[in-house]
A protein has these predicted regions:
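Aromatic- and carboxylate-enriched substrate-binding clefts and catalytic-loop regions
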Residues: 6-8, 57, 256-258, 369-564
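Edge strands and adjacent loops of beta-rich recognition modules
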Residues: 94, 180-206, 328-330
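Predominantly extracellular/luminal regions of secreted and cell-surface proteins
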Residues: 150-193, 316
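Extracellular beta-rich ligand/substrate-recognition surface
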Residues: 196-209, 244-253, 507-509, 513, ...
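Aromatic-lined ligand-binding clefts that engage carbohydrates, nucleic acids, or primary amines
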Residues: 215-235, 270
Length: 564
């Protein structure tokens, strides 16, 4: 078994009494409430209550291991399957954007992205939960990734030609450019890499795009579709509107899922209408081919990389008791400051000190209740992201600003990113210790501020880097009297809209190992840095952090997560 310390769990204050018994068939571990019986033949574990009633059992062992090696680190692709009755429901998994609540029979990919928060915990209406102790990209349900349309169907364009769909690209009338018509073998333009496959030099802003033709399933069953969109999009299948118009801003696309029963060999019309939003925009339609319904409806979890299968079974008399068990394992949430429960005022940044203080003063003069005002990003000099310094041309006296806020009986929460421009002293402090992710620097990735500046994110998996991150905040912001900390982009989102392989390159390798293995827990480590720093500095003051990403255990750092 691995000797690595779990990032998710906390040490337990007391041991639970248990007994161990063995027969020719199994080994049983029994507590006062639960028995776990491990088959000596298959390794299958069956969990029963004290009356012998089965609560959960693995599916004939249900374990799959595939040996892999990533960046010199050995591990396994892993999957665990449990049996599940038809009337079971599953909830949890974090915060996803596809309008799903009960995950029974559904599929969900667990990775971190702006507005997508992945938590490897699922709770059942049968009053148990599974905490999956793994930090890599994971999948609930089907372990396969979504396939392109041409891998699952025979595609025919609107003229009857096999091999793809007809893509019609109508430019904005203001461009005086001609319409482009071409064959698309699949609809997969979902990131900065794949949008290069769109028509060259075609301006998406203000255009209208249509993909149409027919598709023929190569097998019968329930097909699960995944629509990826930025801008406005509709989908018609078999001449029926199956996805009414949806919209998403181009810099942060979204996914939507739907499923259809289809028959092998049938010819089915397909039409996708897309109005891109922005100069770069994204769209995609992919699919999972059918698996047997009894397989689709089981409880199954897959992870890209781990040392072993490691999960916690939590049982209770009701869901509250299961959640209590989850808190016991991952850490209890400290009581947050009372003021944090009050009214907040926030906007896409106040640009000056006068705006912040003046806005708060207006609330007080109008006798509108308010407890917290929020300073969003870009209060620093334009070329000094990560300096944690106010731009004195716009915020001439930050200490007075905070004091003025406090004098009006309010609090200030400030946005802090784990991002640093390479020209800042803070970047250099991390970099010289090997605590800065290097890929963005090597590729000279410029961000969207001003002319664009090159920078990267610090490695929050390093304990030394955590301490340095807090020390920099303490020296430059904490001493002003800041009341709360808004941890933005803590996925970490080094760059928007990159493909998954490049995302991993941008946020690794970590101090603990390859980013493939440690992909989802960055926000947990980042929150730990600030929480432990604050507790050491001022143990008698309650902590409040707001973070854009989350993971199991985040609550123990007095952290709330917002929708991004």
């Amino acid at each position: 078994f691995s000797t690595n310390k779990s990032l998710i769990t906390v040490p337990q204050k007391q041991d639970t009494k248990f007994t161990v018994s063995e027969t020719e068939k199994d080994v049983k571990i029994t507590t006062s409430e639960i028995t776990a019986a491990v088959s000596l033949t298959t390794g299958e574990i069956v969990f029963t209550d004290k009356t012998g009633k089965v609560i959960l059992n693995e599916d004939n062992g249900g374990k799959t291991f595939k040996a892999i090696e990533v960046e010199g680190t050995k591990g396994y692709e892993i999957r665990q399957v449990f049996q599940s009755p038809n009337d079971e429901a599953f909830y949890g998994l974090g915060q996803h954007q596809a309008d799903e609540f009960n995950y029974k029979g559904r599929n969900e990919e667990l990775f971190q992205y702006n507005t997508k928060v992945s938590v490897p915990f699922v709770i059942s209406n049968k009053n148990y939960g599974i905490l999956w102790d793994n930090y890599s990209l994971s999948r609930f349900g089907d372990s396969r990734g979504y396939a392109n349309l041409d891998e699952a169907f025979k595609l025919v364009d609107k003229t009857g030609k096999a091999g793809g769909l007809t893509g019609t690209y109508i430019p904005s009338p203001r461009t005086n450019l001609k319409t482009i018509v071409r064959t698309e073998p699949n609809i997969y333009f979902e990131d900065l890499k794949t949008i290069k496959n769109l028509p060259k030099d075609f301006p998406l802003m203000g255009s209208n795009v249509t993909y149409e033709g027919t598709f023929e399933p190569q097998e019968s069953g329930l097909f699960h579709f995944y629509l990826y969109y930025a801008g406005y999009m509709k989908v018609y299948i078999n001449n029926e509107l199956v996805v009414p118009e949806r919209w998403r801003t181009a810099w942060n696309p979204n996914g939507y899922k739907f499923a259809l029963e289809l028959k092998k060999g049938t010819t089915i019309p397909l039409k996708i209408e897309w109005e891109p939003d922005g100069g770069d925009s994204y769209c995609g339609l992919r699919v999972l081919t059918p698996i047997a319904p009894e397989e689709q409806n089981k409880l199954a979890i897959f992870s890209e990389m781990g040392d072993e299968i490691d999960y916690y079974f939590i049982a209770g008399n009701n869901m509250d008791e299961v959640i209590s068990g989850y808190r016991t394992i991952t850490g209890k949430a400290p009581i947050m400051p009372k003021w944090a429960m009050g009214y907040w005022q926030s906007r896409e940044r106040y640009k000056t000190q006068d705006e912040v203080v003046g806005t708060l003063r207006e609330f007080r003069e109008r006798q509108i209740p308010i407890d917290n005002i929020v300073q969003d990003w870009s209060y620093w000099p334009e070329n000094a992201w990560g300096s944690h310094e106010f731009d004195l041309n716009r915020f001439p006296n930050p200490k007075k600003m905070v004091d003025d806020i406090h004098s009006m009986n309010a609090h200030l929460m400030i946005s802090v990113w784990p991002k640093f421009y390479r020209t800042t002293e803070h970047f250099k402090e991390f970099d010289e210790r090997g605590w800065m992710y290097q890929q963005a620097i090597k590729d000279s990735i410029c961000d969207w501020t001003g002319p664009g500046y090159v920078g990267s994110f610090y490695d929050a998996y390093s304990e030394g880097a955590q301490k340095l991150f807090w020390q920099q905040l303490k020296d430059h912001l904490y001493h002003l009297g800041i009341d709360a900390w808004w941890m933005d982009a803590s996925e970490p989102n080094v760059r928007d809209c990159t493909d998954m392989d490049y995302r991993k390159a941008l946020c690794g390798p970590t101090a603990l190992g390859p980013s493939t293995k440690y992909f989802n827990a960055y926000s947990l480590m980042n929150a730990k840095a600030i929480y432990e720093g604050l507790r050491e500095e001022d143990p008698d003051t309650r902590v409040f952090q707001l973070t854009r990403s989350g993971f199991s255990g985040l609550q123990r750092y007095s952290t709330a997560t917002w929708s991004g």
